[in-house]
Amino acid sequence: MKEHEVLANAFAMPLTSPAFPRGPYRFVDREFLIITYRTDPDKLRAVIPAPLEFDEPIVRYEFIRMPDSTGFGDYTESGQIIPVTFYGHKGNYSHSMYLNDEAPLAGGRELWGFPKKLASPSLTRESDHLLGTLDYGPTRIATATMGYKHQPADLEAVKKSFETPNYLLKIIPNPDGTPRICEIVQYPLIDVTVKGAWTGPGALALTPHALAPVADLPVLEVISTIHILSDLTLGLGKIVHDYLKK
């Protein structure tokens, strides 16, 4: 393979059989269980990378079921999203993400900088409630429950919430371990259709784990719980802050 051929095909690793395809990345029947909770402000401050900031010590714990995603297949994800501001503009910062599928794990980290790790999340219907669980190895580190479709949510308000910018901290090292890329990436969710959304009673329990520290942002008070069914496209990102150019 000639040098120009290498460059022409240098989309993802491995060169001759990339772990994920080129986009667009469309998700059909993407289902969310989101529990919004209040946490310790000092602990939250310790994990949000400047120049991102927070107004209120709020975390959204999410379980996401993705049965039909272009190029990524059928998988489930779980993690923590933090409402932030970026120079005064409201957004969402992805703090932790755990999933059970290699293609979106590799693609999420390499393309956008999603903080993805391999684990075993699930989102299921259990009689009269939704059940979200996250296992890291044999250890259960997160359990969420929600009463099933108790009250309809405002679909227009839910769709509007998908327009909020999303932020990631992307880090890729040089071969010697020093940072080659260290930047804040912003990405959108586009072509969103909200098929249904419901609220209801919710509960969330987090268990400490050395390598999956979701409990480091403790649950002090559950504020709200929502269940969403949607179709959407995960848009590509742009660099909005480069730590290495300061």
From Swiss-Prot:
Keywords: Decarboxylase, Lyase, Schiff base. The keyword Lyase applies. InterPro entries: Acetoacetate_decarboxylase, Acetoacetate_decarboxylase_bac, ADC_dom_sf. It is an enzyme of class 4 (lyase). It comes from the Bacteria. Its EC number is 4.1.1.4. Catalyzes the conversion of acetoacetate to acetone and carbon dioxide. Belongs to the ADC family. It catalyses: acetoacetate + H(+) = acetone + CO2. This is Acetoacetate decarboxylase. GO terms for molecular function: acetoacetate decarboxylase activity. The keyword Repeat does not apply. The active site is at residue 116.
